[in-house]
Structures are given as structure tokens and as C-alpha cells.
UniProtKB/Swiss-Prot annotation:
Keywords: Cell membrane, Competence, Membrane, Transmembrane, Transmembrane helix, Transport. It comes from Halalkalibacterium halodurans (strain ATCC BAA-125 / DSM 18197 / FERM 7344 / JCM 9153 / C-125) (Bacillus halodurans). It comes from the Bacteria. The gene is comGB. GO terms for biological process: establishment of competence for transformation; protein secretion. This is ComG operon protein 2 homolog. InterPro entries: GspF/PilC, T2SS_GspF/T4SS_PilC_CS, T2SS_GspF_dom, T2SS_GspF_sf, T4P_ComGB.
Amino acid sequence: MLEQGYHLYEAVQFLAIHAPSSAQKKMNAMLMDLRSGYPLHKALDHLQLPQDVQLLLYVSERNGDLAQGFRKSGELFKKREEMKRKWEGAMRYPLLLIIVTLLLMFILMYFVLPHHQTLYRSLQIELPVITKLVIACSEKLPWLFTAFFVVAILLVLTYFVTFHRFPPTKKVTVLLRIPGLSQWTKEVITCLFCLTLGGLLKGGLSIMEALSICKEQDFFLFFRSEGEEMMLELENGERLYECLRRRPHYLKELPFVVENGEKTGNLAKDLLYFSDYQLEEFERRVKKWLVAIQPIVFSMIGAVILVLFLAMMLPVFQMIGAI
């Protein structure tokens, strides 16, 4: 609508008319803020958008290209929701099977197997190894579940008591030390940095001006300290790619992208292209995980059911063979 010549207020007003009742209240509050002279990024607080989406809109507001910013943030939000739906859809059936399998294990281990064990003892039948293992596991399961829940509660408490209160730089440092989360953290920070800086540079700002805006924004607090530190380093004569190369929280390819962009004069274009590439790579990996996770879960469930079946039936076959 902005590309068709509508003013921002008119576009939001038009969308509010056709929005669901729950969204209309938020959009009307947003309209009141716009009418009162608040900037867009402040008025958007009523919509409770994700921080990365708000950051993109803030950048587009500062460089004067709101239409492109809304399109880019909309695409990002749409991809996020699509991946979320695919993940939920792929995990719904396996989770149901896991719950059913756990119930089956509970019934067999605590109601059926004890009676069979008493019967086989009275008949002086030696139980197979697999049945003994299942019985031993059933005796340890309550302790394992208790330990699991205690650890889960401790992790939640640790997050809210300590990690949640850490400054942004320390949070990133902790995440980089956790296996499995380190690479994901680098990808998220790199992608947001490229989208933010690339969008600002595309609007005609210099690198120093773009970093100054990063230092002022309130949506991604980590970039506030990053912007301030990088500005000091650039004032001391360093190049941007040298600043990035020393930082462990960016992908190792980013300094080369920045160095090449500075040489060719296409830094904004290269940063935006690199961010799009990283988003596509992340989406491709998620799809790959979704394809792989279902067979793995089904195989594990099948193996558990097979073990329970053998634990129940082998003593029966052994008893029949002894007759």
C-alpha cells in the first residue's frame, strides 16, 4: 500500500478496518500513537512483534524506505511462522506415539510384569536376560524420571535467576560455549547484523552513521554495545572487517564479505545478499532435520515396543517349550 502512494497512517487505518477484532484494538492504539506524533517503531510496540522484525522496521524507518522494510520484515516473519508450523506438524504424530509408548511401558512394567515375575518364580523358570533387563529398568525408572524433573527445574531456575539477568554480551558469551547452540547463535547474530547494517547503508548512510543508529536502538541490546565498540575501533583507524574478524560471535565468512564489499563499493548489497543466503541455508537445514527426525523417532519407538514384546513373550515361549 505504501508503494501505491498511501500514507502510513492511511495504510494502517485501512488494515485496521479489515483486521480481526483482537488485532483492531492494538492497531487503533497504534493509530492514536501515530496521530500523537510518535515514531513508527514506538507505535509498533502495541503489536508485540518479534524483536528482529521490530529491528528491521526501525532500520527501514531510519533510512526512509518503509515499504521495503515492511516487505522484508513480512517475509522474515512469514518464514518464521512457516518453519514453526512445519516443525509442529512434523512433531505432532511422533509426540503422540511417544506418549502412548510411555503409557504402555508404565502399564507393562508396573502391572503386567510383576504378575508374570511371580508366576515364573513359582514355576521355577529362569527368566531371559532381556526380561531381567526390563525389570531392572522398571525399578530404576522412578529415580530416572525424578532426576530428569529435578534437573529441568534447576535449569529453569538457573535461567530466570542468573542467565536472564546477564548483560547481552555475557549472554552471547555463555551461548557460544554451549555445544549445539554456538553455531546457531553465530548465525542469528550474523544475519541480524547484515540485515541491520546493510539496510542502513542502502539508505545512503556511512558506516559510522549506521553504527551510531545501532547504538541507539532498543530492540536488540547486544548491537548497542557492538555499535559503540566498533565506532571506537573505527575511529582508531581500524577497518570494519578487522573489527569483525576478532569477534567470535560472527560467522567466519562475514569479514571476507565485508572486505570484498568495501573494495568493490557494494557493501550494502553484499551484506543484504549474505543475510538472504544465511536465511535460505537455515531454512534448508530445518527441512533436512524435519525429514530426518521422524524416521529416527519412529525407529526408537519401534525398538522400545519390540523390547517390551520380547520381554513379555520370551518367558511364555520358554514355559511352553518346557511342557
